[in-house]
Amino acid sequence: MYAVIATGGKQYKVQEGDAIYVEKIAAEVDSTIELNEVLAVSKEDGLVLGKPVVEGAKVVAKVEAQGKSKKIIVFKYKRKKDYRRKRGHRQAYTKLVIEKIQA
């Protein structure tokens, strides 16, 4: 059984026991959260698609870690004009472990 969920503007195909990295969610480490935006659920009798979400379906996940990804360097440069700009960015993420899919 798998589900397609949407969080942080992205979609993820998940199964029970999967670990996924999503955009930062404001939750404590080792807490349990419910993801209610379930777009599709695969059951024994077939695939159930939501319009736009599946009614009554939710995915329960445990927050395993909060962190930042690798640094991305953005460097702007204009020749002959003595213009240089160097910026760094580290995107915050949340690591989730899928515990249960309820549909």
UniProtKB/Swiss-Prot annotation:
Membrane-spanning parts: none
Protein name, per record: Large ribosomal subunit protein bL21
Source organism, top-level taxon: Bacteria
UniProt GO molecular function: rRNA binding; structural constituent of ribosome
Keywords assigned: Ribonucleoprotein, Ribosomal protein, RNA-binding, rRNA-binding
Functional note: This protein binds to 23S rRNA in the presence of protein L20.
Cellular component aspect of the GO annotation: cytoplasm; ribonucleoprotein complex; ribosome
Subunit structure: Part of the 50S ribosomal subunit. Contacts protein L20.
PANTHER family with a match to the protein in the record: 50S RIBOSOMAL PROTEIN L21, LARGE RIBOSOMAL SUBUNIT PROTEIN BL21M
Ribonucleoprotein in keyword set: yes
Disulfide bond sites: none
Biological processes, Gene Ontology terms: translation
HAMAP family xref list: Ribosomal_bL21 (MF_01363)
Gene (name only): rplU
Cited Pfam families: Ribosomal_L21p
Organism of derivation: Clostridium acetobutylicum (strain ATCC 824 / DSM 792 / JCM 1419 / IAM 19013 / LMG 5710 / NBRC 13948 / NRRL B-527 / VKM B-1787 / 2291 / W)
Coiled-coil regions listed in the entry: none
